[in-house]
Amino acid sequence: MAKLSNEELLDAFKEMTLIELSEFVKQFEETFDVSAAAPVAVAAAGAPAAGGEAAPAEEEKDEFDVILESAGDKKIQVIKEVRGLTSLGLKDAKDLVESAPKPVLEKAKKEDAEKAKEALEAAGATVTLK
């Protein structure tokens, strides 16, 4: 069988009905022993299992928002750190620092969030992780 290009495969899929595509996906999953389920659905399914227990959910949290609560006395140093942590320009970083409390990083990995918090606090800022 000749190898099909991505465009040829997409053209073939465009001609199929939803039922035919659904059957194709099932057969593909069985043949290659994979799942086409979105990883988000797995994470969302795990959330209700935690129930009302907030403490264990916080321990397992792997994404954090770094919130700048205040710049403190060394505003220029904090602006420099914000620019170093983000891709913001000087004006945008200054506006962010002056309008605190504001998120500096969103959905950052735990290690990155902690490093950012330490750097901002070393520059004189007050920071929280959420």
UniProtKB/Swiss-Prot annotation:
It comes from the Bacteria. Pfam families: Ribosomal_L12, Ribosomal_L12_N. Keywords: Ribonucleoprotein, Ribosomal protein. CDD domains: Ribosomal_L7_L12. Disulfide bonds: none annotated. PANTHER family: 39S RIBOSOMAL PROTEIN L12 (PTHR45987), LARGE RIBOSOMAL SUBUNIT PROTEIN BL12M (PTHR45987:SF4). Homodimer. Part of the ribosomal stalk of the 50S ribosomal subunit. Forms a multimeric L10(L12)X complex, where L10 forms an elongated spine to which 2 to 4 L12 dimers bind in a sequential fashion. Binds GTP-bound translation factors. This is Large ribosomal subunit protein bL12. It comes from Cutibacterium acnes (strain DSM 16379 / KPA171202) (Propionibacterium acnes). The lineage of its organism: Bacteria, Bacillati, Actinomycetota, Actinomycetes, Propionibacteriales. The gene is rplL.
